[in-house]
Amino acid sequence: MTSFREMRFDDLFKINSLVFDALTEVYSLTFFVKHLSQFPGLSQVAEAPGPDGRPMGYIFGQYQLKKTQEPYGHVAALTVSSEYRRLGLATALMDYFFMVSDLKGASYVNLFMRISNQAAYQLYTSMGYAHRQTFADYYPDDPQPESAYELRKYVPRPLEVQ
């Protein structure tokens, strides 16, 4: 049975093999260390059963609290190993992050994704995320940059009656 737990610094070396998947954005070790330091409790790893606890997937999240806008959660990175896709791991990781963002008082959760990744788009929209805007040439790939969709899912809040 898959186990889910909070990401630790020593996991960064274990998840390295997942980073080289064609559908995964490649970030530096510094990126991941910074996220674990700045946003404790917002990153989670899914582990395979067995003594080695092989990583099956992970999510890195952020919580943004700026004076100029409402607080929100941001999915910085979500990856599930190709051999474990279609098992509901991405949904479980996203649901976890949405719940934590809600508990922290977020108004919504957002993410950015490549417009060519239709499987991810279908997953996110099936979970209630909606297209907010498109950013041209967001991913500066060689030789051809690719645009990104920003998707959002709002946290339901009760209406206040006065």
Placement of each model-derived feature along the sequence:
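Short Asp/Glu-rich motifs
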Residues: 38, 120, 143
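Conserved acetyl-CoA-binding loop-helix of GNAT-fold acetyltransferases
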Residues: 80-82, 86-99, 118, 122-126
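Acetyl-CoA-dependent GNAT
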Residues: 2, 9-83, 94-104, 154-160
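Short coil/turn segments at alpha/beta junctions that flank glycine-rich nucleotide-binding fingerprints
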Residues: 87, 104-107
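Short amphipathic alpha-helical segments embedded in low-complexity Lys/Glu-rich regions
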Residues: 31-37, 109-116, 137-140
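Conserved catalytic-core motifs of GNAT/GCN5-like acyltransferases
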Residues: 110-112, 125, 130-150
